[in-house]
């Protein structure tokens, strides 16, 4: 067996007994790795027990949202009972929460309201990215990299190359927390908030390079996310690409060489995100919509290679 999952409260009993028994019977350990998880706590950080009346049934959390059913839980707190409510959670959101909210060995608070508010939106954002990508032509050959990618496409592919590398390292080390956090951060921030906003105009103008870029990233993103949310990623990948993100034989490999130029582009990410945020803030301060033209904004020299895309994105005049 490759791994034995268990709670930390039975290390000196079941873990030691199992190791002793397997050694006596087979003269070798019964498993290679031990996954020692933390304990589920109530919203106030206390262990759940019948005597405290603070237990939350996991099945009721998993079923929250199924068939339109909402969830409600009365939990006894230190001072008074509180009513917790949620509308949509389900198994995929539950898995994402467990993978992303605590590192291995750490205790974790079980609060359905927080699970929904912090993680259902992550799935919604990834779903919306995939739905947005579905509007544009799917490449005939995902492995055929366009020869004249613009600076913005090269930048996001360089970012994604590092994501692929770091997530694979996490999976190999059974570091589910780190891998999931990396995917979450990329899929909810850099990709939609910055690159997609830069690329929308080109996508709507039938730019084949932009279409190749978004589909290549979405397809591989669903694959590396499938160990956490298999049903969610299977549905999206089957719908978009006619194949399951779960049914893969090899980990996705970046088609962009993760070398010096990729590092140089990634070093511009902070400047790029800061410039976008400052420009959006300037529009808000002037009472302008984000789609409105704006004067007096200068693109910094360090971002000169993105000038055409940033000018179109922010409607700079």
Predicted regions and their residues:
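A short glycine/serine-rich beta->alpha loop
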Residues: 1-9, 80-83
